[in-house]
Amino acid sequence: MSFNTFGHLFRVTTFGESHGPAIGCVVDGCPPGLRFTVDEVQAALDRRRPGQSRFTTQRREPDQVRVISGTMDHPEGGLVTTGTPIGLLIENVDQRSKDYADIAGSYRPGHADVTYDLKYGLRDHRGGGRSSARETAMRVAAGAIAAKVLPGVTVRAALTRIGEIEIDRARWDWAQVSENPFFCPDPETVPVWTDYLDGIRKRGSSVGAVIEVVAEGVPAGLGAPIYGKLDADLAAAFMSINAVKGVEIGEGFNAARLTGEENADEMRTGNDGRPYFLSNHAGGILGGISSGEPVVARFAVKPTSSILTPRRTVDKFGTEEDLITKGRHDPCVGIRAVPVGEAMMLCVLADHLLRHRGQVGTTPVWPFQRG
């Protein structure tokens, strides 16, 4: 199976399976001389780690990361990148493959079981193998490295919708995101989601979600016309995350409801001589190139396909049957997708910054300034 690598200059290759001995990634193309600590990578992983609330899978994985290549000890503490491939490894410690023994020959509705089997002639029934969201832990680790390539850039994400219940954007407070198990920026929505998800969980069902990712401090000039568009790469990055079924940039699909006057981001010249935008319907990207405004994207995550409700399916011999998926699963997998979305934004921006430097050789700036 190929296509395990993402990026052009800042390249991330992941490996390992959900129920294998370990998962890992190789980050290639990271510039030398960047300082970081294992604790910084671990802190990012801890935000995604399973088993932290009753609303995520109860699989107990500590996700302790090891840096096995590409760095040296820095004299002042921590590590420094050498410019060679950075290897990151996490051992799996809480696999329960026996939970899947009864359905080894059955295709779980909504999962990649049938398509993997049709393409490769075999599949890993133990938690889905490579198709499991377990793989995304390594994306988060890679994102922590990518952040070091992007000084001055802040990437944050939040959950804005679970099922039919959406936050009140007028109450958006980034400080609240780390204060609840949902990464929710609206404190008044937290108890509503709590009751709602408790009901979903007790029924043995699941529900989808929407995540919004915002990157601030992104310089103008990242991205390229036509086939190297920043927003195209962001869309590909988010769509590569397990269970993601839709992506929008800026105003997204809502732009189809607006007039040209409403959607256009008008510009003025500030007192410093630099132009600025009066709005950001474009989500910080015009013509595939960053404008200097915050880059804003959203992606939709479908309900977890593994549920306790019996569903009709077939086995590999074509026999119809009722299937109940055992094991430990997220009632809303979108919750833990929040740090994954941040990581993919970071990896794309790091890649595009290095590509910009390689092609243009300068730091992106506004094209006109007053002396």
Swiss-Prot record:
Protein name as it appears in the record: Chorismate synthase
CDD domains associated with the record: Chorismate_synthase
Subunit organization: Homotetramer.
Biological process, per Gene Ontology: amino acid biosynthetic process; aromatic amino acid family biosynthetic process; chorismate biosynthetic process
Catalytic activity annotation: 5-O-(1-carboxyvinyl)-3-phosphoshikimate = chorismate + phosphate
The protein's role, per its UniProt record: This reaction introduces a second double bond into the aromatic ring system.
PANTHER family: CHORISMATE SYNTHASE
Binding site residues for FMN: R130, S131, S132, N242, A243, G287, K302, P303, T304, S305, S306, R328
Domain of life: Bacteria
